[in-house]
């Protein structure tokens, strides 16, 4: 059995799709119950945030498990399976492990390095555990992911990476138009990056912030938060953007959309009513870009995009922290997978030792029958000698096979051991079931990774 991830996030879908897929606490339990009704799925967990909905499951078969999860999410969202898969990404086995570790480390967030997602992973696991839908595989995977996330945040400066991008953009803007103190700003996007941008704009001394977002309630919530700091703020839907540009000095965009949301026509309309010539700075923090590239060619408009931002020393330092975090994730993935492979060979080794013990006991019984007059002391000495010989013969190969099993492709060594010593697979499975204890499941990790959408 392997881990399968089926997800949709800000990287693969527009906000409208994420809204259709949104999952609250009661929805989570319902979704998992539906997924687990299939015999192909043995464990499941839902990770739901404002920027992603992901189902992690332990499945008996890749295609069967994928079909089950896709159908459940299709019914939940009201989208056809065909439309859903246009925005979905799939990770399997090693790739699923790497993805969850990256998510926990803040590397897949709209704001690189944000810590909120670590708590969201913890709550996703706690909810699944409370509903008894995680077994040994997802338990171990989740606990390791949480540990990796903590390590990334404690050993790198990635926490400041997102803030660095915004601050570098605003510093660049000030070089063009001077101090932002007392200025008017338009903020396009009210997600986690938008909240961070609002904070940086307030620190820069802006007098007024107009928050524009596809969903007005979300914009209103951010505007209310801004007002709590004594700054004038109002919320507007997207179609109000052009008139807001007329009085704006700076625009910051960070929507996470998959295509530009600020068009050349929008900016044309906004600047058409400007009474006196002015410079407008637009900081496009979107990846991919939020602003139509043609906007940069308009007179009086200066666009600061991610390409320009990442050329700045501070932003490059933040990128270095992200690279360091990715290095940690890669090392932890390799360590986790090696541990899983070693754990998989353990039942085979245990079955081999049990087989050897059974042979020893059978031979000692045969000895008792052939030499009934053998006194207890001599009998014990013979028994101990035979057991020591068997233990010494088995020690080197069993230790070595565990070491070799930790390497990629190491499962072949366990198979060779079963063939060489004619170990009954049912006996090995019985040992494995005993060693798993109350947590069901296992993790036979392969290397298949599939994308239904290459934007992820």
Swiss-Prot record:
EC number in record: 1.2.1.70
Active site: 50
The keyword Ligase is assigned to this record: no
SUPFAM superfamilies membership: Glutamyl tRNA-reductase catalytic, N-terminal domain (SSF69742), Glutamyl tRNA-reductase dimerization domain (SSF69075), NAD(P)-binding Rossmann-fold domains (SSF51735)
Marked site: Important for activity: 99
Keywords for the protein's UniProt record, in alphabetical order: NADP, Oxidoreductase, Porphyrin biosynthesis
Domain remark in the UniProt entry: Possesses an unusual extended V-shaped dimeric structure with each monomer consisting of three distinct domains arranged along a curved 'spinal' alpha-helix. The N-terminal catalytic domain specifically recognizes the glutamate moiety of the substrate. The second domain is the NADPH-binding domain, and the third C-terminal domain is responsible for dimerization.
Protein name according to UniProt: Glutamyl-tRNA reductase
Species of provenance: Mycolicibacterium vanbaalenii (strain DSM 7251 / JCM 13017 / BCRC 16820 / KCTC 9966 / NRRL B-24157 / PYR-1) (Mycobacterium vanbaalenii)
Gene designation per UniProt: hemA
């Amino acid at each position: 059995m392997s881990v399968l991830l089926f997800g949709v996030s800000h990287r693969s879908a527009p906000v409208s799709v994420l809204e259709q897929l949104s999952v609250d606490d009661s929805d989570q339990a319902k979704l998992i119950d539906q997924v687990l009704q299939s015999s192909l799925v043995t464990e499941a967990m839902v990770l739901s945030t404002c920027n992603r909905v992901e189902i992690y499951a332990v499945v008996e078969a890749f295609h069967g498990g994928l079909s089950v999860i896709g159908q459940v999410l299709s019914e939940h969202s009201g989208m056809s399976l065909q439309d859903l898969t246009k925005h979905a990404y799939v990770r399997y086995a090693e790739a699923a492990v790497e993805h969850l570790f990256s998510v926990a480390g803040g590397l897949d967030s709209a704001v690189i390095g944000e810590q909120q997602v670590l708590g969201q992973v913890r709550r996703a696991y706690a909810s699944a555990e409370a509903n008894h839908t995680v077994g040994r595989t997802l338990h171990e995977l989740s606990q390791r992911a949480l540990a990796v996330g903590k390590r990334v945040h404690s050993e790198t400066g990635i926490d400041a990476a997102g803030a660095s991008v915004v601050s570098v953009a605003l510093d660049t803007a000030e070089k063009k138009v001077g101090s932002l103190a007392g200025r008017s700003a338009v903020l396009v996007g009210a997600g986690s990056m938008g909240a961070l941008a609002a904070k940086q704009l307030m620190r820069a001394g802006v007098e007024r912030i107009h928050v524009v977002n596809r969903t007005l309630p979300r914009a209103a919530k951010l505007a209310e938060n801004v007002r709590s700091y004594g700054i004038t703020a109002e919320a507007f839907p997207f179609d109000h953007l052009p008139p807001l540009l007329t009085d704006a000095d700076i625009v910051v965009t960070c929507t996470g959309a998959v295509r530009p949301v600020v068009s050349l026509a929008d900016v044309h309309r906004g600047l058409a009513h400007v009474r006196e010539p002015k410079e407008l700075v637009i900081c496009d923090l979107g990846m991919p870009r939020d602003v139509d590239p043609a906007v940069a060619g308009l007179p009086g408009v200066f666009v600061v995009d991610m390409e320009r931002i990442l050329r700045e020393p501070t932003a490059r330092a933040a990128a270095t922290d992200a690279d360091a975090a990715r290095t940690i994730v890669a090392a932890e993935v390799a360590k986790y997978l090696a541990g899983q492979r070693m754990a998989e060979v353990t039942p085979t080794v245990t079955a081999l030792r049990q087989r050897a013990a059974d042979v020893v006991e059978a031979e000692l019984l045969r000895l008792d029958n052939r030499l009934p007059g053998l006194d207890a002391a001599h009998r014990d000495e013979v028994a101990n000698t035979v057991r020591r010989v068997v233990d010494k013969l088995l020690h080197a190969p069993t230790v070595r096979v565990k070491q070799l099993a930790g390497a990629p492709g190491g499962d072949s060594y366990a198979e060779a051991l079963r063939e060489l010593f004619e170990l009954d697979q049912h006996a090995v499975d019985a040992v494995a079931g005993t060693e798993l204890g109350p947590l069901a499941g296992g993790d036979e990790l392969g290397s298949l990774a599939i994308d239904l959408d290459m934007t992820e």
